[in-house]
Amino acid sequence: LRTIVWYNIPMKAYKYRIYPTKKQAQTLANTLESCRVLYNCALEQRKIAYKQFGISLNYYHQADELKDLKETFAHYKQLHSQVLQDVLKRADKAFQNFFHRVKLGDKPGYPRFKGKGWYDSFTYPQSGFSLSDNSKGNQRLKLSKIGEVKIKLHRVIKGTIKTCTIKREVDKWYVCFSCEVEPERLPKTNKSVGVDVGLEKFAALSDGTMVENPRYLRKSEAKLKHEQRKLSRKKKGSNSRKKQRTKVAKIHRKVKNQRNDFLHKESCKLVTNYDVIVFEDLRIKNMVKNHRLAKSISDASWSKFVEYATYKAVSAGKEVILVNPRNTSQICSGCGNTVKKSLAARTHKCPCGLVLDRDINAAINILRLGTSPGRATAVAGL
């Protein structure tokens, strides 16, 4: 049986750099700190209410107390009401996810308090922000309670802006607009493809195409270790330690940006060139339990690759299908017989005479599973 997930209204995110003044940057940092404290208080209140009184609080219970919060703690009057509401929604979402994991029998992971520096964004869900040009023709982002901030709109925003999120990444500030957009259909190619993701090669396609694994984290590992060792030698609380921590964070940011750029480009190629894209429905959480492969799997970011391909396919009118990964590498794509092979064996050789790369063999099997009636486990598309 197949489960079909329909996306009626695609959402698209636009991210831009903003350039606050020193005073504005301090206000943004203070806003993040106030949001962090509120988030932690919301978690603590829920914890106490349940332990002492057996009461499960929800978002609405806590949102009703925001007015009293502002009266008691005057600095919260400096924050837009919807920003505060969004903080409580995040806390509520954390508990919803916790209960969902408990229901599924997964490792629950009770919602955690956010330490300093670990709450890096706040959101205006519906109002409190606007875009405009000043008298000199420069672009500005007006934020309620903060003022006009310089922004660089390097590309045109399409669709209707639904939310505005301000995010701090190390020493830089960004804004991310979540927009409701009309699907932009791409021309049909009448082609389907199976995709087998891996570590040796990032991906093998059923048409024989191989995508190299860039291994961005591995390439930066030596430099990262060097800077982390320097960080460990710095005195806690010192300015030199803060500066060194920023250096380490910048390396991580560069790796993250390189990886995301690669994933966007490769997923875009798939959606442009194929109408139907079939992936394995991999359980990444279980796979990273193998400590020898965990870092390489995380560096490859297979889940994010599938996620990017899926939302691009939704907007383009294409289809993404997920199939059971069981034995896709062991079954011969030519005759259907099982040919056992170890991970070290990179070539598929079958008594039927078929000889080809094991990953391409798997990709062909993945395509067959995805396009056979009733064999797919999940489908995403329009």
Language model region names:
Residues 21, 135, 169-170, 206-209, ...:
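Short acidic-glycine loop/turn motifs at beta-strand connectors
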Residues 49-73, 158-163, 169-306, 373-382:
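Substrate-contacting helices/loops that form the catalytic groove of nucleic-acid
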Residues 2-9, 295-296, 300-382:
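Positively charged, low-complexity nucleic-acid-binding target-recognition regions
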Residues 42, 87-98, 360-370:
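Stable alpha-helical structural segments in soluble proteins, enriched in small hydrophobic residues
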Residues 119-181, 187, 303-307, 311-315, ...:
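Glycine/proline-rich, flexible active-site/cofactor-binding loop segments
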Residues 61-167:
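Acidic carboxylate diad motif detector
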Residues 2-84:
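Gly/serine-rich nucleotide phosphate-binding loop at the start of the catalytic core
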